[in-house]
Structure formats: C-alpha cells, structure tokens
C-alpha cells in the first residue's frame, strides 16, 4: 500500500507537469495559429465523448485499422483524442490514435516497453472494457471529485502498475477545472465492473 501511495503521488506530479506543458503549448498555438488543410476523412463532431457512442465508434475504427485480433494494454478516451495500446502477438505493443472529427486512426506506431514484468500481465481482452459504463462513471466521478465547475477530461482503462494478484484492469476518470496555475484536478478510479475504488 505504501508503494501504491508513492506511485499515485508520482503519477499525480507527472500528470501536473504534462498538463502544464500542454497548457503552455496551447497558449502558444493560440498566439501563432497555423492554417492546416482539412483531411479528406474529416467531419464535424458535436457529441460529448463521455455521454454518447463515441468511445464505441472510436474503438471500432481502431479495430478496423488493426485488421486482426488483438489484446489491449490501455484504452484512453479524451474529448479530442482516443488512444489504444494494442498487441497482436503478445510480444510487442503498438499505438493507434483517433482524433476528434476523424474517421481514420493514425498508426500503428511502436511502443517502447520498460520494466521486467511479462507483457502478458499488462494485457486484457477487448471484452473486459465495458464501454457502456463510461457515461455513468463520468457522472459519478464529477460528484465524487467535488470540484466546483469540474468536468471529465479523460477516461482510461488499464491495469494499475502496482496491484494485488487477481485484480482486474481499472477505470480511471480525470476530473479537472481551469488551467495552471489556477487548476484543480482529481483522479477517480473504479474496478472493471464500475465499482468505486478511490479518489486522489
């Protein structure tokens, strides 16, 4: 449990640094916008990622792009981007990204794996991720986070790095408000069936 606590603290610090960098990049992009051509597969997407069929549609698009059976290491849904880390052979992992308003995912891109644990310990079957839970989890996480004006910005499903034997992958919902330095956030976790685990 001590290892889990320190891991969560380090993950929180890492996420804070990442979001601060993203906020800075977004500010710079607003100051110096660069016109880009409209991709052929682009369309206007107006639905909320966490209250619609967008997660299922995104995973279906990634399935088509992979073109064969695979297991998942991580699924991450955010309003602007869906990320899937997949393994077709149980030995290597590839990343697929699907941007909001696009029909075709980008990928595969190889993922550099670190650590000594067997890859198989971090992979799960596609059916383990019950995407029907996402709207309910998103609503519940906002309530549990208790951040005034907070909203869900990402939902992910993966095994925790530090876990007990036999534990299932975990849903992690990020709730936040504002941008650094005026920024509040919390991670709310649930087991594979949607039972609340923790908020930090």
Roles of regions detected by a PLM:
Residues 2-15:
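Hydrophobic single-pass membrane-insertion segments
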Residues 12-85, 89:
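Extracytoplasmic low-complexity, Pro/Thr/Ser/Ala/Gly-rich segments
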Residues 14, 39-50, 155-163, 169-170, ...:
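Predominantly extracellular/lumenal beta-strand repeat domains
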Residues 20-39, 99-120:
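Short, compositionally biased low-complexity segments
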Residues 47-52, 126-135, 190-191:
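General structural signal for secondary-structure boundaries
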Residues 61-96, 157-189:
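Exposed beta-strand-loop-beta-strand "reactive/processing" segments of non-cytosolic proteins
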Residues 94-114, 181-200:
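A short, surface-exposed beta-strand/turn
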Residues 107-153:
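Long, charged/polar, surface-exposed segments that mediate recognition or autoinhibition
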């Amino acid at each position: 449990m001590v290892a889990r606590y320190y891991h969560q603290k380090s993950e929180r610090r890492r996420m804070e640094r990442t979001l601060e960098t993203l906020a800075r990049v977004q500010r710079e992009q607003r100051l110096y916008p660069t016109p880009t051509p409209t991709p052929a597969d682009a369309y206007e997407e107006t639905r909320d990622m966490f209250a619609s069929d967008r997660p299922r549609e995104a995973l279906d698009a990634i399935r088509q792009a992979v073109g064969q059976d695979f297991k998942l290491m991580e699924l991450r849904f955010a309003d602007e981007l869906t990320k899937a880390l997949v393994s077709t052979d149980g030995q290597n992992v590839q990343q697929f990204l699907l941007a909001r308003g696009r029909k075709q995912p980008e990928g595969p891109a190889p993922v550099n794996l670190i650590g000594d644990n067997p890859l198989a310990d971090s992979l799960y079957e596609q059916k383990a991720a019950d995407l029907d839970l996402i709207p309910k989890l998103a609503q519940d996480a906002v309530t549990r986070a208790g951040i005034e004006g907070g909203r869900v910005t990402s939902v992910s499903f993966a095994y925790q790095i530090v876990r007990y034997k036999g534990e299932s992958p975990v849903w992690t919902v990020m709730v936040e408000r504002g941008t650094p330095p005026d920024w509040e956030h919390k991670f709310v976790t649930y087991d594979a069936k949607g039972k609340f685990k923790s908020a930090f």
